[in-house]
Amino acid sequence: MDNDIKAWLFDILSAIMEIESFFIDRPKEFKKYQADIRTKRAIERNIEIIREAMSRILNRDQSIEITNSRKIVDVRNRIIHGYDSVSDDVIWGIIIRHLPVLQIEIEKMLGE
């Protein structure tokens, strides 16, 4: 694996860890997330970072498979190009369902 891909994988992992850090001192509760605009915007920004790094990886090496990469790319595009069309439910689904899987995959890739 080339050094650029490793760096982008670390970017993804760092963004996931930052998102997780918002929930260290409190449980992951949708209502609290929904009411906290600063946390929502910070998470959206980290999803943008994840998407950009993921896009660069896939452009460099199309043989790399990342689960749900298309969904993450699509959500990032909706964040960038239409804030009003990104529902809290969609972002929350990424936080709860997709990021834990992505974190495991990235850690495994970095460990190889």
Description of each model-found segment:
Residues 1-112:
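Solvent-exposed interaction patches of small proteins and small membrane subunits
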